[in-house]
Amino acid sequence: MPNQEVFPKGSQAAANFTGAAFVNMLVPDVSGTYNCQVYDVIFEPGCRNDWHTHPGGQILLCTDGIGYYQEKGQPARRLQRGDVVEIPPQVEHWHGAAPDRSFTHIGISPNTRKGGATWLLPVTDEEYKQATGGNNHV
């Protein structure tokens, strides 16, 4: 099935990513009314974000492609359409696309009154290679 975007492709992320990613803020919640942000992120093949934490946690709703999620010190989890990832507050993690496939998710950052993401070091090429392990993406 060809990729049929649900939301328009967002702006290219300028920082905190290795590779090309596009972010469309669906619910920026600038006023704080909802105490959460909702965003659509498209990762081009091989793209991943830096290690980071969220003071209020994060939820990922995987909508297209093949991706990976990894918590610091844990094995990576392969993600595909329909997967849901619940990330507790302050858990250091990264997520991104498979080496040869794009990946899209809806991200939800709850409890935004606690603050935004804390961005840490980039995921190294070695960490990424070990996490994705040349897996077959069928």
Where are these regions (language model features)?
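A short, N-terminal "cap"/entry segment at the start of jelly-roll beta-barrel domains
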Residues: 1-35, 116-138
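A short hydrophobic beta-strand segment most commonly corresponding to one strand
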Residues: 38, 86, 100-119
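Catalytic core of non-heme Fe(II) oxygenases with the double-stranded beta-helix
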Residues: 21, 25, 33-34, 44-53, ...
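Short acidic-glycine-tyrosine-enriched beta hairpin
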Residues: 73-90
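Asparagine-centered strand-capping/turn motif at beta-strand->loop junctions
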Residues: 96-98
